[in-house]
């Protein structure tokens, strides 16, 4: 058997090949020496996680409530919602064809809307649809399992239980949702809370009710009937579920006295990201296979996320496929055989011009995210069109000002699978009864926050229809 070998002398042969191309690529007064590392010093700081204080409301299913952002820390880096999901038992008196489970992406869908306000003016917002899109295109595979555990995609919550079975565990299950507000994107855009003593800062939540999140099915109901059943307290479950302890945690940076003094001394403009969600519109491929939707966004749009949501079951919030999930015993198949993307191709029109003409869904689900997003979704039905070279990058890398455009339309042409499933003729479980859909589109835009004289004020009004520039 021969032994592997090499020697240092052979490396000098490589060094001797230096020529014109190498002169262009290597050397010069600004060249980097990879073997003498320079230390990039930072200012002195530490970081500490703390729970935020409740301000208004009751943190419960179906309620609106808020927490106050403390100014005790210098910079707000990240925030996350921590919720205890209670155990729920399906009545043992029911037939064995019944099963109960929580909806997929439970922590996403618990949030009807979350906002951050400065003196009651909304600076940023997001909803469950943005949470679905954002995580699908930004959470890498190496973190996906951990993220799923945080948001409730665990077997003890989303796998169906038979009569007498219990979802969750005694004492409840603690779930965590990272809140993707603009200040959490990078430490360079952290919210300088210590420089804002005259602003009342709040994070506000609107929670969905439990019956919008729990799913009861009865397999004895066969097509053309749907297997979904409305839950009745006292018949199917003994009592309405009640959330356990709910907290909002914040990670703060504490800086030196010198840096703290400088925070309020100069005007500072911060480039931030905001989310706009267009009103959802019914998508009926049986009667109109190529509907035209008018979308009205504003500001510098860097990315568009869109999908057709399958709303056959109102509580299946995160289903963007042609078929409904299929329950078999103690398991559920969220993408059963015969489940496809409801959209075949999409046309984007503005200024009476086809910006994109009948682009196939493979472009929006595979090609565009391959080049312009951190990751490609592993789920059916997610679509991205990025104006930015890399939409996850904080630096401006491409956008279009939708406030300057007129007559913006999106035309998502239905796939043959969507047409068949809408008529209940899909031929496979999950699409063998009539499916119903709605069109969802979300935009991410850039905007500017100005901090001056210890205040954040608005030059133009922030609104749900379009966030405006917030300056002081």
From Swiss-Prot:
One of its GO terms (molecular function) is structural molecule activity. Keywords: Capsid protein, Late protein, Virion. GO terms for cellular component: viral capsid. InterPro entries: Capsid_N, MCP_C, MCP_C_sf, VP_dsDNA_II. The N-terminus is blocked. Pfam families: Capsid_N, Capsid_NCLDV. Its main location: virion. The keyword Repeat does not apply. It is found in: Virion. Major capsid protein that self assembles to form an icosahedral capsid. Represents around 50% of the total virion protein mass. Homotrimer. Belongs to the NCLDV major capsid protein family. This is Major capsid protein. The lineage of its organism: Viruses, Varidnaviria, Bamfordvirae, Nucleocytoviricota, Megaviricetes.
């Amino acid at each position: 058997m021969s032994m592997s070998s090499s020697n240092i002398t052979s490396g000098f042969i490589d060094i001797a090949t230096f020529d014109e191309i190498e002169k262009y690529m290597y050397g010069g007064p600004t060249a980097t020496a990879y073997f003498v590392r320079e230390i990039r010093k930072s200012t002195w700081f530490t970081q500490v996680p703390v729970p935020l204080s409740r301000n208004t409301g009751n943190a419960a299913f179906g309620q609106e409530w808020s927490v106050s952002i403390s100014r005790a820390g210098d910079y707000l880096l990240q925030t996350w919602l921590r919720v205890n999901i209670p155990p729920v038992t399906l009545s043992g008196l029911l037939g064995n064809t019944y099963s109960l489970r929580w909806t997929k992406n439970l922590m996403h869908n618990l949030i009807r809307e979350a906002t951050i306000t400065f003196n009651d003016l909304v600076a940023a917002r997001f909803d469950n649809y943005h949470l679905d899109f954002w995580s699908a295109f930004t959470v890498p595979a190496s973190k996906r399992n951990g993220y799923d555990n945080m948001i409730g995609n665990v077997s003890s919550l989303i796998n169906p239980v038979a009569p007498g079975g219990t979802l969750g565990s005694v004492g409840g299950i603690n779930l965590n949702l990272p809140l993707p507000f603009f200040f959490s994107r990078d430490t360079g855009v952290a919210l300088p809370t210590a420089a804002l003593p005259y602003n009342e800062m709040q994070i506000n939540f609107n929670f969905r009710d439990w019956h919008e999140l729990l799913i009861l099915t009865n397999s004895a109901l066969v097509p053309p009937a749907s297997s979904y059943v409305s839950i009745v307290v006292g018949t199917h479950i003994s009592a309405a579920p009640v959330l356990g302890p709910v907290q909002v945690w914040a990670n703060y940076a504490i800086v030196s006295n010198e840096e703290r003094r400088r925070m309020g001394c100069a005007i500072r403009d911060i480039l931030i990201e905001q989310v706009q969600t267009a009103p959802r519109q019914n998508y009926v491929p049986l009667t109109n296979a190529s509907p035209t939707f008018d979308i009205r966004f504003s500001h510098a749009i860097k990315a568009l996320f869109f999908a057709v949501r399958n709303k056959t079951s109102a509580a299946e919030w995160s289903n963007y496929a042609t078929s409904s999930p299929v329950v078999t015993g103690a398991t559920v198949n969220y993408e059963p055989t015969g489940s496809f993307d409801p959209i075949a191709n999409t046309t984007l029109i503005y200024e009476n011009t086809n910006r994109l003409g009948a682009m196939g869904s493979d472009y929006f689900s595979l090609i565009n995210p391959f080049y312009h997003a951190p990751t490609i979704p592993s789920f059916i039905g997610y679509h991205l069109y990025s104006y930015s070279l890399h939409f996850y990058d904080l630096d401006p890398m491409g956008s279009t000002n939708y406030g300057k455009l007129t007559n913006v339309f999106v035309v998502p042409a239905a796939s043959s699978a969507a047409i068949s499933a809408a008529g209940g003729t899909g031929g496979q479980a999950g699409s063998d009864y009539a499916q119903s859909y709605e069109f969802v589109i979300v935009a991410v835009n850039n905007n500017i926050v100005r901090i001056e004289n210890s205040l954040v004020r608005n030059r133009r009004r922030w609104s749900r229809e379009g966030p405006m520039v917030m300056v002081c």
